[in-house]
């Protein structure tokens, strides 16, 4: 299965010493009325880009200390392709409201990962991304054009 041009997936965490990731329902499952994320399937979420990972984290002001947060970048290895739920399935089944933006995929078993490095994410918006959510709970939250905004925060790789 071709993931991206590098065949690489990424996962971000605040923990610097992970070697394995265990499937679970994310602690920040989108519970807003205008959003939807599956709350039943235990999974490890990956994205084919760092930006997709940042968008998928749904960072809030509480995540930043002095205007920044350090996140550790992991990449999985030795994945069983049969246990990957690809982005097309997530989007097609409307499992995550913004999967069409994050391009996330899921792994349904424990995943071995290697640490690639760390990034610092700043609470400054680099780009506002307007998108059509896959599923909407309450249309009153939509803009008049039927879309939502999400924010990509600035980040840099640490030395």
Regions inferred by a protein language model and the residue ranges of each:
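ADP-ribose/NAD+-binding catalytic cleft of ART/PARP-like enzymes
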Residues: 1-43, 58-59
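Conserved NAD+-utilizing ADP-ribose enzyme module
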Residues: 2-5, 36-44, 50-159
């Amino acid at each position: 299965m071709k993931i991206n041009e590098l065949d690489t997936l990424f996962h971000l965490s605040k923990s610097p010493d992970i070697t394995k990731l265990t499937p679970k329902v994310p602690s920040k499952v989108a519970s807003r009325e205008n959003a939807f994320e599956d709350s039943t399937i235990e999974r490890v979420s990956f994205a084919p880009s760092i930006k997709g990972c940042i968008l998928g984290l749904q960072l809030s002001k509480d995540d930043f200390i002095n205007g920044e947060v350090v996140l550790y970048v992991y990449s999985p290895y030795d994945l069983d392709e049969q246990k990957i739920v690809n982005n097309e399935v997530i989007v097609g089944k409307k499992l995550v409201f913004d999967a069409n933006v994050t391009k996330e995929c899921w792994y349904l078993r424990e995943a071995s990962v290697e640490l690639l490095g760390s990034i610092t994410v700043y609470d400054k918006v680099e780009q506002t991304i307007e998108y059509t959510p896959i599923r909407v709970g309450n249309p009153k939250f939509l803009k008049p054009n039927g879309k939502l905004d999400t924010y990509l925060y600035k980040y840099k790789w640490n030395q």
